[in-house]
Amino acid sequence: MELRDTIPGMLSPDYKERFTAEYEQLSIRAQKLETFIDNYRHSRLSFKPICSIELLEQQLDIMKAYIAVLEERAKIEGVHVR
């Protein structure tokens, strides 16, 4: 799934569809950041990032915590994610 695939869900009048789209977007972004960090750590980037790996890892940790919050809400609210 790509970010563009989540657009219909984000535009839906149904909050459960918007919720699912938000979860999907965050998951996609977190996975891409995780891949980026791995490539950064192993010198596989074609450029030198300005941000430190530590700051990017902090961002990823927060994104993962946000994903966990959304998963807990999904259970409570009966929204199917993943």
Regions found by a protein language model. Name each.
Residues 2-82:
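Extended, charge-rich alpha-helical interface modules
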